[in-house]
Amino acid sequence: MSPKTLYDKVFEDHIVYEDESGSNLLYIDRHLVHEVTSPQAFEGLKNAGRTVRRTDCTLATVDHNIPTISRVNFKTLLTFIDQDDSRLQVQTLEQNVKDFDVTYFGMTDDRQGIVHVVGPEQGFTLPGTTVVCGDSHTSTHGAFGALAFGIGTSEVEHVLATQTTIQANPKNMRITIDGELSEGITSKDLVLHVIGVIGTAGGTGCVIEFAGKAIEDLSMEARMSICNMAIEAGARAGMIKPDEKTFEYIKGRPLAPKGDEWEKALKYWKTLHTDDGAKLHYDIKIAASDIVPTITWGNSPQDALPITASVPDPANVSDPIKKSGMERALKYQGLTPNTPFVVIKMHKAFIGSCTNSRIEDLRAAAKVAKGHKKADNVKLVLVVPGSGLIKKQAEKEGLDKIFESAGFTWREAGCSMCLGMNPDILDPEERCASTSNRNFEGRQGARSRTHLMSPAMAAAAAIKGHFTDIREFDYVDNDEPSITIEHEVEDKELQDAVYEHEKEIIEGTPGTEAERSTTSLKMNQNSKKPNQMLIKMVPITVLPFLTGITAPLYKANVDTDAIIPKQFLKTIKRTGLKNGLFYESRFVKMPMVRCQTDFVLNVEPYRQAEILLVTGDNFGCGSSREHAPWALKDFGIKSIIAPSFGDIFYNNSFKNFLLPIRIPQDVIESKLVPVVKAGHKLTIDLPNQQIKDGETGDVLIEKFDVEEFRKHCLVNGLDDIGLTLQKEEYIQEYEAKRREKFSFLEGGSKLIKPIKGTKKSIYGNKAQEW
């Protein structure tokens, strides 16, 4: 047997069917669901009369939209969530999980929290599994040796209906961090440094495996922070091989295998590593000694530099696109070139998000805050735990009192200020020291200015009133044991809090291999019949040829937040989003009026553009929001040509019959831009994979690349779910093999103990809070 990478092993163990073109039907072990990207998916199931195939493999919670203010007086969603659109999304999820019998942690459940915190905390995330969620930071779960990636809403519906997703096979990239990290250097510094080295498009088309002694020395929570931000390097996923730390973290958690199943799982998990001699497409080595406390300065995570550095100067950059991007970023951020980072003052700080809201992060921030007060110029410091259980554990350790004594604000679990879809936002031009994962324009509020850093650095900035090198920070004392616990036991007390829900044995809950297999089989049998009857495919959109006005966009790293800002995501429909397309670029908001800018899509003839020609790399980087292709399609755009795309955006585009075409930047500039500047339309011939001058018929691009399966679907207007359900026999065959080989995965979310007052069943608890 030829040597394989960690990724290869997990991927190959989940192939249900591989067609001649190389597209793979991949089985999904774990599906996490939240309120923002699921409404349209459940609506699709209802409209087609389909069910959720594997409710035991599905777990839902609310996180993005919910307020993080105290829930002491919580009565109902109606009175607690003020924003109508946010409330509607949460209410819609609660109705959907009830209708489809999906296990759900709502706002009165201690287990509620950010999906990427809840999954590992409950033991739902396991090594060697495939994990998906309608959220780009699903890569977090790769810290366990899982293949975890974000998907769009159409794929959420696909997974709900079929428990599979159609995937091409990405390339293998390994990033080895040699040596030991210096004192005071965290996983956040490490991953920001990596992104600064390879760029936000460096991992495009790849799964990154993080390796080396520096990675092995990290705790599981720190590893999660690393994999969480793999997506910011353009990767499809990030992975770290499981080891004894991984197994110790998982053992005994509510949804982890027990007894003989644990031993069986452990035997398999210990095979999950990259073999010597395995094929790597890219093998990058970084010295741990080169990594220092790191901070971002611009509007992309790749704009990362040491805290000891100064704001970069565009005058030193020759590339016109890069120079223009830097100038725009500095203007937006209100920064002057060559200003030392350590003198830049800030207004607010945010400690939280799926990157840095775990107990280890809170302990690190509390260690800094202890005995200090926030600076007078700092208006607000939000500390938001990743789950209700983490909140309870932090309060048990007295961390909340440390934060409150320092003038910080202690909140309930949720995504909070990470993306500003809820009431936690920055005012225009406020500068924030943030432990989140993205510093895009408007990410934390209109005209907000975000700087990414570690929890300790954010807390130190809040105390000092300006960005600070944590290595030079004066701690009040070294009384570490009261708020810091050694890595070997750091999770134990939190696990006790998690296990409080699991102390009583649930009579009738399947726990043995045989019982789990029986349970899973019953679930499958119950869910197959309705979906099997609905495999008829109805052509939706046919896109063989397109001749259209082509709008040029001279910009790189156009992220999904720029394509459609977060305020337009609070919808339960797929339509009506064209007014939100490039909103911050197309409109200037003046008092009582909204004025159009000279952005290309506001200018004739490009108001009628059907093709978008982008000259810079990495179009559509960032989040998994399918709202981006929905908005483009709603405007009338049918194809985007660019040097490269964010992987999730690329997939989402095909799901919506929007054709993304990759063409090298030099070819775009030499062959396509002159034609567009001359006012000619472009013609896209999909069957022959050519691009022509729409006026003369001259062939400009002899052959562009597109996967055969995706081309077939676009040309014929075929529905992915309908195509997949035609392969029902292969799915059933895989599920039978899974019940035998991976029996420790059976039962999943349905093994959760019912909370007091809920009805018991052989599947665990029903969906809660109705």
Curated annotation (Swiss-Prot):
Pathway: Amino-acid biosynthesis; L-leucine biosynthesis; L-leucine from 3-methyl-2-oxobutanoate: step 2/4. Disulfide bonds: none annotated. It catalyses: (2R,3S)-3-isopropylmalate = (2S)-2-isopropylmalate. Coiled coil: none annotated. GO terms for cellular component: 3-isopropylmalate dehydratase complex. GO terms for biological process: L-leucine biosynthetic process. [4Fe-4S] cluster binds at C354, C415, C418. It holds the Pfam family Aconitase_C. GO terms for molecular function: 3-isopropylmalate dehydratase activity; 4 iron, 4 sulfur cluster binding; metal ion binding. Belongs to the aconitase/IPM isomerase family. This is 3-isopropylmalate dehydratase. The gene is LEU1.
